[in-house]
Amino acid sequence: MLLSGRNNRHPSSLVYNVHLFKLPVLQKSKLASIITISCIFYQNFVVDFPEPKPAMPDNSVQHRIAEKPWQKIDEGLETAEFNSPQKSFIGDSRITVIRINPDRYAFKLIAASENNKQHKTAPEWYKDKKLLACVNAGQFNLDDQLSNMGYMKNYSHVNNPNFRKINNYNSILAFNRKDTSVAPIQIIDLKCQDWAQLQTKYHSFTQSISLITCNKQIVDNKQKGKWSMVLFGMDEKGNVLWIFTRSPYTIRQFSEILLSLPLAIQQVMYLEGGPETSLYLETNGKKIAKMGSYETGFWESDANQQYWPLPNVIGIVKK
């Protein structure tokens, strides 16, 4: 997650033995006391080494894994992997992208708040809702463990009625359109688009942090923390891009990296970061299973190998 409220939470390898992230709902408030005790040992016995400096960007075509990186999964569904031109200090610095044609695939907003308040991992949501793929729907509130940090509505169900007006929460993903006068899915930029008019055109919305604006400009985000991340993007042709990195970067770093890749990016918004970061696809003989790990100030390790339970996901099905 990318939340100031988590800055006082510390990682420790001792926490891994608790196995709390296997529970149906990760009770982070209860985890705080365990982490506090663990950090006493962490601070006393672990030496902090200086973070290695990342390598300088490589602007040549060598940052691509292939000159034609896209692999077809099905009609209107493709995937690609890229070597980041800026190397992270942890992991393989690989970026996974799933490209989805919204003319062929419908998007579903799935919230625990309208599904018996049951949290599920991404693979569990995938199976339960008969999806082809799914991803985080945004950061969730750590207090109630259900509501999105920003506005979220799905048809008549309101997960969070409140607009978040801080921390660059200027992007609202809108889909399940009411008529064909608008695109089937879009990221509404509150800084340059008419929200009052567009909110009448769709059934499903989720609000989050803007990374790249409607004018292809990087938002000036000064946060110095680094995270594994999954993002929601749109390209110049109106395709959806699900973008994942397990290797951690700052928000600004990663935005710059994305604009350097051959993705034809139009807009990008943040979905989730750290160990909650989830991306899962299984269809037509192809499986992509990605989970995040590193998060500054909370989970400063690349050791996470399990999906964490989530209250809200976005999934796709064929039209």
Regions found by a protein language model. Give the residues of each.
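Intrinsically disordered, low-complexity segments enriched in small/polar residues
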Residues: 3, 74, 89, 148, ...
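Active-site beta-strand/loop microenvironment that shapes enzyme catalytic pockets
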Residues: 129, 158-317
